[in-house]
């Protein structure tokens, strides 16, 4: 987030906290009072239009977050459990194959 966006956001929060209507002029005057000079007027206009008619405190209190995951179907859980059990059996089979390859005499130094 740029300095312009941060300054305008903080100014909007200050105005909302005081219960003052958020307008571009009030945002700009608050930013100038804070001696922040690099904020272009477009930012204050955009923020004022975006927050027009909205309760900023209500927006902050109702910030949504990612909800919990949906419960998995039972069939999927059973498939995962079976998949977890299957690799153990496959590992034993692979070890037996490796031993049989060594007995065939394909080594370099035999």
Swiss-Prot record:
Annotated region (Disordered), positions in chain: 87-110
Gene Ontology annotations for the cellular component aspect, listed alphabetically: cytosolic large ribosomal subunit
An example Gene Ontology biological process: translational elongation
Entry's Gene Ontology molecular function annotations: protein kinase activator activity; ribonucleoprotein complex binding; structural constituent of ribosome
PTM annotation: Phosphorylated.
Alphabetic keyword roster: Allergen, Phosphoprotein, Ribonucleoprotein, Ribosomal protein
Annotated Pfam families: Ribosomal_60s
Keyword Nucleotide-binding: no
CDD domains: Ribosomal_P1
Top-level taxon of the source organism: Eukaryota
Role: Plays an important role in the elongation step of protein synthesis.
Family as reported in the entry's similarity comment: Belongs to the eukaryotic ribosomal protein P1/P2 family.
Subunit structure: P1 and P2 exist as dimers at the large ribosomal subunit.
Protein's name according to its UniProt entry: Large ribosomal subunit protein P1
Native species: Alternaria alternata (Alternaria rot fungus)
């Amino acid at each position: 987030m740029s300095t312009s966006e941060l300054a305008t956001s903080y100014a909007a929060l200050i105005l909302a906290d005081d219960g003052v209507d958020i307008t571009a002029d009030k945002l700009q005057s608050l930013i100038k009072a804070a001696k922040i000079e690099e904020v272009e007027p477009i930012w204050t206009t955009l923020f004022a239009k975006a927050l027009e008619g909205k309760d900023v405190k209500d927006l902050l209190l109702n910030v949504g977050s990612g909800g919990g995951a949906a419960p998995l179907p039972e069939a999927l859980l059973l498939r995962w459990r079976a998949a977890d059990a299957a690799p153990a059996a496959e590992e034993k089979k692979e070890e037996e194959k490796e031993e049989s390859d060594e007995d065939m005499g394909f080594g370099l130094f035999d």
